[in-house]
Amino acid sequence: MAFANLRKVLISDSLDPCCRKILQDGGLQVVEKQNLSKEELIAELQDCEGLIVRSATKVTADVINAAEKLQVVGRAGTGVDNVDLEAATRKGILVMNTPNGNSLSAAELTCGMIMCLARQIPQATASMKDGKWERKKFMGTELNGKTLGILGLGRIGREVATRMQSFGMKTIGYDPIISPEVSASFGVQQLPLEEIWPLCDFITVHTPLLPSTTGLLNDNTFAQCKKGVRVVNCARGGIVDEGALLRALQSGQCAGAALDVFTEEPPRDRALVDHENVISCPHLGASTKEAQSRCGEEIAVQFVDMVKGKSLTGVVNAQALTSAFSPHTKPWIGLAEALGTLMRAWAGSPKGTIQVITQGTSLKNAGNCLSPAVIVGLLKEASKQADVNLVNAKLLVKEAGLNVTTSHSPAAPGEQGFGECLLAVALAGAPYQAVGLVQGTTPVLQGLNGAVFRPEVPLRRDLPLLLFRTQTSDPAMLPTMIGLLAEAGVRLLSYQTSLVSDGETWHVMGISSLLPSLEAWKQHVTEAFQFHF
């Protein structure tokens, strides 16, 4: 499998020693160097296939493009703001994170922030250290009976919910992905955002920073909130519009805010940090010994599992590949690449629409991981993209002038096992269709344009194939073709024919090497092409 040939990994930020040990026990060489400049980082990466970072190292486009051997970047943490995902994807570099490692620590910090907001603990502490005794100034509010709005109900959001419910808080929330039935199972009633704002005494955000979540809390939404609402952001700077938050604090619409993250870190504009009703931390959500150890352990295990071909988890820029490492899917990935390579050789760098069709119950959801493999086969030589792979295939196929669609049909009546994996290429009204399936763990070619092979043709990476179509059954044809092979110094290793379809027969020869030219062949047959994937 691709991405399973790592040899050496650079760890460029401080991580728990368990990370290095797990990598080494998994057979990987490990180099640990911290506080590297961009130039030093590039120099170190010249001999590394893998890179593991936390948040300090900036994996920019310059770094990615200069790191010729780099195949995988692992972020020991959740956010990947410090990795240029577009540049990594374009170069076919896999980016992974550890989505579970920080969850508990971030949730606990959020809960602590809510309690501090309710009782003004940091402000009271500062007052005491200043030699004052101001009991009346720091009148707080109970959490019991208050409503907490949780925006984002993934791992962290649900951990916050269950903890704050123990304080007697009513938890409501919103998440476009998590179903209301699932959130109800951990005690959160989902409502539309416009219904959430006026109900909440406290609001906490736990979403990624996306165009749709940037400025989620803004002047308009603050105006819809209950007067005196308190806001917590331990997720990503920018989800809460900092200018709008400051205005809401100054007007009293917002009674307090607790911020662990900022649009700019560290923030140069100190207006929010210095506001008396703002509690702030220097991005401490993952700063616990347990989270650091867990993140280091998780990213190392993910690297080792990937190298061994066991699994692929935590993928950020190619989520469809997660299933590509399953024992069932692996041979289908090989089949898809083989059919893509066949199509490129047959149709001659096609332009138009590539249709990837899966059939059979076991392939119902496989289209998203099979279509990139088809694209790899189509583009690997035709576009001279030596580094085209399952990560960047969908990006590069658009630049090649191709459109890719996927569809699925159920198994044929009476079909018990795996369905067929089909690929159709439409080219200026001249359809090309190759049909394949997997027998055991071997990809095989079942048919071309309706002509069926019995038995099917094995598709092996070490076996070049020559395919040609004839209209008549000429007894002298096979000796002639073998003679042409001999003239080119190429040996015949296997030979199969299709059943006759519309008066024509497809022939498939396994040969020792690709022929330098097919011109002599085309004088004797209707069409011919060869490929090796």
From Swiss-Prot:
The modification N6-acetyllysine is found at residues 21, 58. NAD(+) binds at residues 78, 155-156, 175, 207, 234-236, 260, 283-286. One of its GO terms (biological process) is neuron projection development. There is a cross-link at residue 21 (Glycyl lysine isopeptide (Lys-Gly) (interchain with G-Cter in SUMO1)). Changing residue 261 to M: In PHGDHD; results in a four-fold decrease in substrate affinity and a slight increase in maximal enzyme activity with 3-phosphohydroxypyruvate. One of its GO terms (molecular function) is L-malate dehydrogenase (NAD+) activity. The active site is at residues 236, 265, 283. Pathway: Amino-acid biosynthesis; L-serine biosynthesis; L-serine from 3-phospho-D-glycerate: step 1/3. Induction: Induced by 17-beta-estradiol (estrogenic ligand) and 4-hydroxytamoxifen (agonist/antagonist ligand). Positively regulated by the transcription factors SP1 and NF-Y. The modification Phosphothreonine is found at residue 78. Its EC number is 1.1.1.95, 1.1.1.399, 1.1.1.37. The modification Phosphoserine is found at residue 14. It is an enzyme of class 1 (oxidoreductase). PANTHER family: D-3-PHOSPHOGLYCERATE DEHYDROGENASE, FORMATE DEHYDROGENASE 1. Belongs to the D-isomer specific 2-hydroxyacid dehydrogenase family. It is linked to Phosphoglycerate dehydrogenase deficiency: An autosomal recessive inborn error of L-serine biosynthesis, clinically characterized by congenital microcephaly, psychomotor retardation, and seizures. Neu-Laxova syndrome 1: A lethal, autosomal recessive multiple malformation syndrome characterized by ichthyosis, marked intrauterine growth restriction, microcephaly, short neck, limb deformities, hypoplastic lungs, edema, and central nervous system anomalies including lissencephaly, cerebellar hypoplasia and/or abnormal/agenesis of the corpus callosum. Abnormal facial features include severe proptosis with ectropion, hypertelorism, micrognathia, flattened nose, and malformed ears. This is D-3-phosphoglycerate dehydrogenase. It comes from Homo sapiens (Human). The gene is PHGDH.
